[in-house]
Structure formats: C-alpha cells, structure tokens
C-alpha cells in the first residue's frame, strides 16, 4: 500500500515542493536583515534547484541532473564555509550580524 502511494508521486509534487522551498528562500533573502538567516535562505534556494535537477533527471532517465545536483552540493558547501567566515569577521568587527548596520568594512 505504501509503495503504491510512493509510486503515485509525480513531477508536479516535486516541483510544488521545489517552488515552496524557492519561495521561502527568496522571502528570507529579501526581507531578513540577519546575515545567517540570509545564508539559510540561499541554501533553501540551492536545495530547490537540486530538487528540480533530480526531478527532471528521474523522469527523463538521464544522469545530467544528478551530476548537476552534486555540483550544486559542492558549491553550497564552499559558499557556506566562505560566507560563515565573512559573517564571523563582521561580527568580530561590528558586534552584530545585521546587514543593514554594516555599510562599511573599516573600523
């Protein structure tokens, strides 16, 4: 019974989840001022792209989506490491992670 329900999941379901994740990520990036929340929004956007790549890869039968998805995962890991290092330096300098209060990089 459970396997029949899982087999009935189509492209529309995956794309709907992807659009919801992308929308939440864009909302976080556009409206929040905390740098860490903005980074989480960017990660949500990248995960939405991964779901799209994997969905079209599964239903087209090719491996290109899987390869793009692995590339995006590596890119997201590097982006997170670099961005968190920048956020830590901003916090050490300005004692805040609010991006609206950081308008210059000098002390």
UniProtKB/Swiss-Prot annotation:
Catalytic activity from the UniProt record: a quinone + NADH + 5 H(+)(in) = a quinol + NAD(+) + 4 H(+)(out)
Any single GO CC term annotated in Swiss-Prot or TrEMBL for this entry: NADH dehydrogenase complex
Pfam families on file: Oxidored_q2 (PF00420)
Coiled-coil ranges (or none): none
Keywords, sorted A to Z: Cell inner membrane, Cell membrane, Membrane, NAD, Quinone, Translocase, Transmembrane, Transmembrane helix, Transport
GO molecular function list: NADH:ubiquinone reductase (non-electrogenic) activity; quinone binding
Gene Ontology terms describing biological process: ATP synthesis coupled electron transport
Its membrane topology: Multi-pass membrane protein
Subcellular localization: Cell inner membrane
Enzyme nomenclature, EC number: 7.1.1.-
Group of enzyme by EC: translocase
Stretches that traverse the bilayer: 9-29, 36-56, 68-88
Keyword Transcription in record: no
Primary location class: membrane
Annotated function: NDH-1 shuttles electrons from NADH, via FMN and iron-sulfur (Fe-S) centers, to quinones in the respiratory chain. The immediate electron acceptor for the enzyme in this species is believed to be a menaquinone. Couples the redox reaction to proton translocation (for every two electrons transferred, four hydrogen ions are translocated across the cytoplasmic membrane), and thus conserves the redox energy in a proton gradient.
Complex and partners: NDH-1 is composed of 14 different subunits. Subunits NuoA, H, J, K, L, M, N constitute the membrane sector of the complex.
Family as reported in the entry's similarity comment: Belongs to the complex I subunit 4L family.
HAMAP family to which the protein is assigned, alphabetical: NDH1_NuoK
Designated name of the protein: NADH-quinone oxidoreductase subunit K
Native organism taxonomy: Bacteria, Pseudomonadati, Chlorobiota, Chlorobiia, Chlorobiales
